[in-house]
Structures are given as structure tokens and as C-alpha cells.
């Protein structure tokens, strides 16, 4: 995919995120997201950053990852994540139609998932997942460069 398309996608994501949800008639989604106790996410597009001969570059590829969060408590700023890699510290913040879920590993990496109070069809909400991690060696199947995923989440409150 040409570099200008990747730049256009990043610009579109930033523009979309900058729009207040209530202004677009999405106040109900805003309230549902604020009350969420469980979020199930699927991400299908990946932008991977690197420094090619010390020049920043990004590649965009299809992806298939899931991220599920439960016991979300906005008042306490906490949540739990389903993970094959063990527990990590999670901090949650909700503000003006954005639910931010920040995971910090004691090994250094930072993961941030943001769910927007924006409809993405079929009961889904727009979402962005980033992984800030760097390793000099690229290991297939593991994060070794900064990554940004675009996808959707559903509110799956127990009921």
C-alpha cells in the first residue's frame, strides 16, 4: 500500500476521533460506553512503524487480533484483561465519549486501547489499539515495533 494512503488513513482516524460524539447524535452510545463493564474488541488493520535507515516509515497490513476487557470500573479507574501473557497493570479513563484502557507491563511496553462512542455498524463501536514496544530483532508473531490497529468493539455487559 503506498505511503500516501497510510498517511491519509492516519489523518482520517485523527479527524474522526476529534469530533464530539454528542454533536453527531450519539449521546446514547456515549452513555452505554460510560456504563460498560465488559468490552470485546476485534482489530483488522495494522499500521507498523519502524525506522528504515533512521528514517521513520510505516506499513499497513491486514490483521486479526482480539482484546477483551472485563470488570471495567470507571469510577476506580480499573479493569482486567483476558491475556495469555499474564496480568498487567491496567488504568481506565472515560472522558467525553472516549474510553481509554491503558496497559503497562513491568517489562516496559505500553498498550493503549481507545473505544469511541461512535457507531461502526451492527452494535459495534470504533476502536484503536496501539502497542508501544521496540526490539532490535523482528520476531514473527510478536510485537517488535510500534503498532496501531483499527477495528471495532462491542459492549458485552453481563446481563
Which residues fall in each region the model found?
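Bacterial N-terminal signal peptides that target proteins for export
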Residues: 1-8
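Boundary at the C-terminal end of the N-terminal hydrophobic targeting segment
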Residues: 18, 22-25
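Contiguous, well-ordered beta-strand patches that form the walls/edges
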Residues: 76-111
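Short, solvent-exposed loop/hinge segments that bridge or flank secondary-structure elements
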Residues: 30, 35-80, 109-114
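Internal, hydrophobic beta-strand segments that form the core of beta-sheet-rich folds
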Residues: 126-133
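Bacterial N-terminal signal peptides
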Residues: 8-16
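Edge beta-strand at a domain terminus
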Residues: 135-159
Amino acid at each position: 500500500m503506498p505511503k500516501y494512503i497510510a498517511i491519509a488513513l492516519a489523518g482520517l482516524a485523527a479527524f474522526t476521533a476529534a469530533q464530539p460524539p454528542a454533536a453527531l447524535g450519539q449521546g446514547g452510545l456515549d452513555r452505554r460506553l460510560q456504563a460498560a463493564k465488559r468490552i470485546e474488541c476485534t482489530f483488522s488493520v495494522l499500521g507498523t512503524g519502524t525506522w528504515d535507515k533512521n528514517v521513520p516509515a510505516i506499513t499497513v497490513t491486514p490483521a486479526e487480533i482480539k482484546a477483551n476487557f472485563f470488570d471495567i470500573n470507571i469510577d476506580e479507574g480499573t479493569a482486567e484483561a483476558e491475556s495469555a501473557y499474564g496480568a498487567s497493570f491496567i488504568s481506565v479513563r472515560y472522558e467525553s465519549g472516549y474510553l481509554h484502557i491503558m496497559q503497562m507491563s513491568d517489562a516496559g511496553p505500553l498498550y493503549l486501547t481507545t473505544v469511541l462512542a461512535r457507531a461502526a455498524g451492527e452494535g459495534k463501536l470504533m476502536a484503536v489499539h496501539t502497542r508501544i514496544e521496540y526490539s532490535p530483532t523482528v520476531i514473527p508473531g510478536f510485537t517488535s515495533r510500534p503498532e496501531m490497529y483499527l477495528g471495532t468493539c462491542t459492549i458485552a455487559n453481563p446481563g
